[in-house]
C-alpha cells in the first residue's frame, strides 16, 4: 500500500492485483499528484471525466464530485472500487464507463492519464471532441518520457491549441483548449488479412498488435492443440486470433474468449462474426480479471499469451494470477498452454504451481510450454 496526500483528501492506495512485499509497486505516480495540483475545488463545474485512471488515485481524490471513470481496463475498474472501499468512500460516487460508451455531455473538467497506445488516445480524444466545449478544462498527464511530439500533435489535431508544462518529479502535463479544428473521420477499427487463411482480422484501438499478427502469436499458432473437446479458454484473448484458430482446429470444442479489455472482447466477437459466423454458438465472450469468479474444474484446456507488464510497469503479477486461476478452473488432467518470451523463465513458475511443465517448442525468442493439472479434486 502507498499513501497519497493531495489537496482533496489523504488516500491509502494499493495496486490490483497486489504486488509482493519485496518489490512493491506504487498505486499512483507523480502525474496523478501534478494533475490534482491544477484543480481548485471551487472551480469544478459540470461533469468530471477521468480517463485511464489505472488504480483509482484520481477518482478517489475527486469522489465528492461524482466523477465518471472512463477506460478500457476492467482491472482498473476493480482497482478503483477496491481503493474506494479501502478509503471508506461510497463506490457509487464514481460511475464507470468503458471507452466504447458515449461520454457525458459538456463536462467541466477532463483529466486524462496518457495511455501507452497512441491509437487508444486518438479514439478517446475523438470521443471527447463530441462532448467538450470551449469552457471545458482539459488536462492530461504522464511521465515526461511518455509525452512525445506526436502526443502533442494529436491533441492539437483533434481538440485544439495545446501546450505542455515544465517537468515536475519527472512528470509533465498537457493543457488543451477545444476550438473544434477541422478533422476527417476515422474508422473505428483497423483490419488486415491473416496470413495463410481467408480471414480478415478487425482490431479496436486498444488491442495489442492491432496492425498485424504479433510474432509471439504467430509462433503459438503453429503449436496449438487439435481435436480437443469440452470448453477451452483463450485467456487474454486480444483480437481473438488464437481462439479463432482453436475453433477451426477443434470443431467439437466450445471456446471462451476472456480479456480485461472491453475493446479486446469486442474485437474477438467481431472476428468470429465476420470469419466463422457458423461457430458463434460454440463461443462465449467474457470481460473479466483473468478467471475470477469462474467455477473450479470447468475447463478442459486454457491457452494464453500472458502479459509481462501492467500499464507502464514491468511486472509478472498478472501472469502469475492467470496461472493460478487456470489451475483452479481446469478439470483434472486439463491442460494449460502458454507462449512467452524465453527470458521470463515461466517454466519454473509453472512447475511450482502445477508440479510439472513440458517445453512444446522453442525458438531464439519464444517458448511454448504445456502443463497439466494433476491430483485429486481440491
Swiss-Prot record:
Its EC number is 2.1.1.174. It is found in: Cytoplasm. It holds the Pfam family MTS. GO terms for cellular component: cytoplasm. Belongs to the methyltransferase superfamily. RlmG family. This is Ribosomal RNA large subunit methyltransferase G. The keyword Isomerase does not apply. It comes from the Bacteria. The keyword Ligase does not apply. It is an enzyme of class 2 (transferase). GO terms for molecular function: 23S rRNA (guanine(1835)-N(2))-methyltransferase activity; nucleic acid binding. InterPro entries: DNA_methylase_N6_adenine_CS (IPR002052), rRNA_m2G-MeTrfase_RlmG (IPR017237), RsmC/RlmG (IPR046977), SAM-dependent_MTases_sf (IPR029063), Small_mtfrase_dom (IPR007848). The gene is rlmG. Its main location: cytoplasm. The lineage of its organism: Bacteria, Pseudomonadati, Pseudomonadota, Gammaproteobacteria, Enterobacterales. Keywords: Cytoplasm, Methyltransferase, rRNA processing, S-adenosyl-L-methionine, Transferase. Specifically methylates the guanine in position 1835 (m2G1835) of 23S rRNA. It catalyses: guanosine(1835) in 23S rRNA + S-adenosyl-L-methionine = N(2)-methylguanosine(1835) in 23S rRNA + S-adenosyl-L-homocysteine + H(+).
